[in-house]
Amino acid sequence: MPRKGPAPKRPVVADPVYGSPVVSQLVNKILLDGKKGLAERIVYDALEGVSSKSGNDAVATLKKALDNIRPTLEVRSRRVGGSTYQVPVEVKPHRANTLALRWLTSYAKGRREKTMTERLANEILDASNGLGAAVKRREDTHKMAESNKAFAHYRW
């Protein structure tokens, strides 16, 4: 454990094309094996596809999709007297954003379209319309928190 306290959060650098830190974070989530150029090409092509299909600004559509995916509650395991309870807790904004990006990319990878660009574009469009697997994941997370509301007094 560090003696100087927690490491400070580094600021997210905005990406050069759209000037948005959210797009930069999405590129870093898509990134595999250090191939950042490939990840950028996938994200930028997907955002172009989003803007051509929806007719709206791509970054605005992405932010709307992330708002629809971002969870407000989640459950965390808490051990009390030999039994483990799933305790609902509020999600901090930074973690909510991270979870939204993680779910968006993971469910885009699991889609059936031919290229990753198409998968990501269609998942962003579905999420912005309140559909898709990533939005369903948020609903399931909220449902778990709702069903375990009885254990909310174990919060820490």
Swiss-Prot record:
Single GO biological process annotation from the record: translation
Organism of this sequence: Leifsonia xyli subsp. xyli (strain CTCB07)
Family recorded in the similarity comment: Belongs to the universal ribosomal protein uS7 family.
InterPro entries referenced in this protein's UniProt entry, alphabetically: Ribosomal_uS7 (IPR000235), Ribosomal_uS7_bac/org-type (IPR005717), Ribosomal_uS7_CS (IPR020606), Ribosomal_uS7_dom (IPR023798), Ribosomal_uS7_dom_sf (IPR036823)
Domain of life: Bacteria
Protein name: Small ribosomal subunit protein uS7
Record has RNA-binding as a keyword: yes
GO cellular component, one term: small ribosomal subunit
CDD domains with a match to the protein in the record: uS7_Bacteria
GO MF annotation, one: rRNA binding
Record's keyword annotation contains Transmembrane: no
Name of the coding gene: rpsG
UniProt keyword list: Ribonucleoprotein, Ribosomal protein, RNA-binding, rRNA-binding, tRNA-binding
HAMAP family: Ribosomal_uS7_B
Protein function: One of the primary rRNA binding proteins, it binds directly to 16S rRNA where it nucleates assembly of the head domain of the 30S subunit. Is located at the subunit interface close to the decoding center, probably blocks exit of the E-site tRNA.
